[in-house]
Amino acid sequence: MEKLNLHGKTGFIIGGTRGIGTYKYHNTCAEAMLLLDGDAYIHVAPAGPADRIPYDAVEVFRVPKGTMVTLRPGVWHHGPFCVDTDSLQTLIILPERLYAYDCTVLTAPEADKLRIEA
């Protein structure tokens, strides 16, 4: 598993892909996502060891436009995936500069990546 260094990054790009291969979590704070202009898929997995994604526990939810999702500290997740469009505006609520001091990101090997089939 490749561990990414996101020091200095403050956001991410949301595209039209439906492949799940990146997971992140924060130890010290919750994260909130507000879907502004469309439905989205969001994947989550329960907290666990920092060096291992619990693939057997990953769940994907379809979240309607206008819904606020709150993720507790330690929950594996990543940005939302578009449902019916190629792009999606999402308000992400996190403490300032969080990615510099509290963001663990892992990328799954190709064989362990999931694909959303709608």
What are the residue ranges of the model-derived segments?
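Short beta-strand-centered segments at strand-helix junctions
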Residues: 71-74
